[in-house]
């Protein structure tokens, strides 16, 4: 049984593993416990008086909604807040409470890794279900399309009037266009031919192809790890994946231009599809464009989801399917001024 003098509030706050901040209505910091100082990579003295958003490259918190809740005398909780500090992304659970003295108490706790993994697995399962549904519909569409095209060809041969044949020509062309779309919806149907070689060969082919499309105000940077081991993969399929991601980055930069970085690294002790690998390859495509809109991020790998006008929304869905066939994974982080897609491919168990 504990005896003696109880610790004061400051001692308690200083011993917590969660980050605790006291801020005013402008979110200027008036107190930060050691955990918060470590998270924000600043001393208490440097933090004092600085508005929290100025300390971060990106802060996903809906500050207006939080302030509305606090003004109404209610607490506020956001179970998934993204902070970017010195280029590193942190996903946290945040709670806010107004104190009688007028300060706002912010408590930030790292999202539990198991919970985050469960969310990723659930999201991946939903994406697979959506992809399977679209493929099933595509199969149902493809069969009558063949009959429609065949009937139009027969009709074209039977029509004596060339003017009428123009209509059958339109039917055939549009049927072919729909068939091409359906084939893309169906995606890869069979595993590719795997070879064991350096992934940098694929990366260089992608660089060569994209370099012909680069405007003068876009810089393509290569940052390869020369020690990355060879790995089994289908070069054509991985080229398709990387080419799609790099072209998406190029389109995201828009007329303002910017920089795209193609990076390779070795990842250690990584779990992919329930299997633990001692070594894996990580291929990053990073750009400094405007970022992916937040309302698209949860569904970005779903078929028919696109943030670009005129886009089909199939490229990333097919890319994930191809990476799944390699027992790998593809993920991304994005905020204004930074988007990074990372492809992981297994090397050695």
Swiss-Prot record:
Any Gene Ontology CC annotation: cytoplasm
Description of post-translational modifications: Autophosphorylated.
Positions carrying Phosphohistidine: 139
Keyword Nucleotide-binding attached: yes
Function: Member of the two-component regulatory system NtrB/NtrC, which controls expression of the nitrogen-regulated (ntr) genes in response to nitrogen limitation. Under conditions of nitrogen limitation, NtrB autophosphorylates and transfers the phosphoryl group to NtrC. In the presence of nitrogen, acts as a phosphatase that dephosphorylates and inactivates NtrC.
Primary location: cytoplasm
InterPro entries reported for this sequence: HATPase_C_sf, His_kinase_dom, HisK_dim/P_dom, HisK_dim/P_sf, PAS, PAS-like_dom_sf, PAS_fold, Sig_transdc_His_kin-like_C
BP GO terms, sorted: nitrogen fixation; regulation of DNA-templated transcription
Entry keyword annotation includes Manganese: no
Full protein name: Sensory histidine kinase/phosphatase NtrB
Domain PAS: start-end pairs: 5-78
PROSITE patterns in UniProt: HIS_KIN
Pfam families: HATPase_c, HisKA, PAS
Compartment(s) where it occurs, according to its Swiss-Prot or TrEMBL record: Cytoplasm
Gene3D superfamilies xref list: 1.10.287.130, Histidine kinase-like ATPase, C-terminal domain, PAS domain
Record-listed ATP binding positions: 329
Keywords: ATP-binding, Cytoplasm, Hydrolase, Kinase, Nitrogen fixation, Nucleotide-binding, Phosphoprotein, Transferase, Two-component regulatory system
Cystine bridges: none
Residue span, Histidine kinase domain: 136-349
């Amino acid at each position: 049984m504990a005896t003696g003098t109880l610790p004061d509030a400051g001692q308690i706050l200083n011993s917590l593993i969660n980050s605790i901040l006291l801020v005013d209505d402008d979110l200027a910091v008036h107190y930060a416990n050691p955990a918060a100082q470590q998270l924000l990579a600043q001393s208490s003295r440097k933090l004092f008086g600085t508005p929290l958003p100025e300390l971060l490259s990106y802060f996903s918190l809906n500050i207006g909604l939080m302030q509305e809740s606090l003004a109404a005398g209610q607490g506020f909780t956001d179970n998934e807040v993204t902070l970017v500090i010195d280029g590193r992304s942190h996903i946290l659970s945040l709670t806010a409470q107004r104190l009688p003295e007028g300060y706002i108490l912010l408590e930030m706790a790292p999202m539990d890794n198991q919970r985050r993994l469960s969310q990723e697995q659930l999201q991946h399962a939903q994406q697979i279900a959506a992809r399977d549904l679209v493929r099933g519909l595509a199969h149902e569409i493809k069969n009558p399309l063949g009959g429609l095209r065949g009937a139009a060809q027969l009709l074209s041969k039977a029509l004596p009037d060339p003017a009428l044949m123009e209509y059958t020509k339109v039917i055939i062309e549009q049927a072919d266009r729909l068939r091409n779309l359906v084939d893309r919806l169906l995606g890869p149907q069979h595993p590719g031919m795997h070879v064991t070689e350096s992934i940098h060969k694929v990366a260089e082919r992608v660089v060569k192809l994209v370099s012909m499309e680069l405007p003068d105000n876009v810089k393509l940077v290569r940052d390869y790890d020369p020690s990355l081991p060879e790995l089994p993969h289908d070069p054509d399929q991985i080229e398709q994946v990387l080419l799609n991601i790099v072209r998406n980055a190029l389109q995201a930069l828009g007329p303002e231009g910017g920089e795209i970085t193609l990076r390779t690294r070795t990842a250690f002790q990584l779990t992919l599809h329930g299997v633990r690998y001692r070594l894996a390859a990580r291929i990053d495509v990073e750009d400094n464009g405007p970022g992916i809109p937040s309302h698209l991020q949860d569904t970005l790998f779903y078929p028919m989801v696109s943030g670009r006008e005129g886009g089909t929304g199939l490229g990333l869905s097919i890319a994930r399917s191809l990476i799944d066939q390699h027992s790998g994974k593809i993920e991304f982080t994005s905020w204004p001024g930074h988007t990074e897609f990372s492809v992981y491919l297994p090397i050695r168990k």
